[in-house]
Amino acid sequence: MMSERIFLASPHMGGSERRYVDLAFDTNWIAPLGANVTGFEQDLQQYLGAGYVTALSAGTAALHLAVRLAGVQRGDRVFCQSLTFSASANPIVYEGGEPVFLDSEPDTWNLDPETVEAAIARFGVPKALIAVHLYGMPGKLDAIRSLCDAHGILLIEDAAEALGSVYHGQKCGTFGHYGVLSFNGNKIITTSGGGALVCRDEADAQHALKMATQAREPVAWYEHTELGYNYRMSNICAGIGRGQMEVLEQRVGQKRAIHDRYRDALAGLPLQLPAEPEDVRSNRWLTAALLAPDCGVTPGQIIAALAEHNIEARHIWKPMHLQPVFRDCAFVKTAERSVAEDVFARGVCLPSDTKMTPEQQAQVCAVIRGLF
């Protein structure tokens, strides 16, 4: 008999979500407006401690609006971290921009500041730069922001995987001109599907809200002076989010405990888990391991072995510059071998579901140990 499925990451309800969802039904506010949407935005804004929050239908919608607000137009270059999910880069192309993909640094696997400098020297100042906090680990934000400030580059902070992560005492999602959050079903909290845009300036937040509601002008008839989108979050989904916010810090603690158990149980094996830099708290959304070169075991073998036990694991994100859809885009690296390519070749994402018990995690570790 097949054992109970152990997921990579799945929705984990806290218990109070239904109360907020029932509120939407009781008041008949089922549309993408209402008390839950407003309340969820306020909860997020209070938690982040900075910025103006607009709840949206997806993290991708938030990224698209950020690219719009940055003024990206056809032919504009936008620098983007290559080691990420495709949603980080797709909105650049939505607006006719040209992605220039940048390599990672080996410490956090995030955007390499030296590569940013090399890209500026090669291509000039971009219209914007998209930096990602991979698997919840904050990137080298001080260096990246310093470069952006020095060259007048708009920073879009893709914190889709990093809600609850903290860099030098400041919450991730609040460092850029625009910050992006995701509440997809696999994220640290979920609204089923959803995202949020964090704007530094209130005027930008108001403009984002306008674009997210079809860019309708405030007149008696339907009038539009710019393109808009149907990107607003449902009041029902926002109700789930309000309940999830009540357990966010608990989920961060659980994710970090999962990472620590992997660190202890897999000690001595030829693999490495990324360490937190000083004065950084990762939410450890997914624990990812980097296998030693020539260790005799591949990520694919680990994934296949775990799958035999009904356990889900996955490869690291395939870098964007290796994706067929972006084959004509430039890629910049400073190391002889691309860090992003190396991490993709040797990395594996381990089950990090907050509903996974310590006993189930011990089973995961036993399967992995059995391969070495």
Question: Can you say where each PLM-predicted feature lies in the sequence?
Answer:
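A short hydrophobic/small-residue beta-strand
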Residues: 78-79, 92, 99, 155, ...
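PLP-dependent aminotransferase class I/II
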Residues: 35-42, 47-53, 114, 118, ...
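Phosphate-binding glycine-rich loop
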Residues: 33-77, 91-94, 101-103, 170
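Conserved coil-to-alpha-helix start sites within the AMP-binding
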Residues: 84-89
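Active-site phosphate-binding strand-loop segment of PLP-dependent enzymes
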Residues: 107-191, 196-198, 203, 298
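Short beta-strand->loop structural element characteristic of the AMP-binding/adenylate-forming
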Residues: 98-108, 314
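Helix C-cap/helix->beta junction micro-motif
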Residues: 95, 150-151, 309
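N-terminal "arm"/small-domain region of PLP-dependent enzymes with the aminotransferase-like
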Residues: 1-31, 351
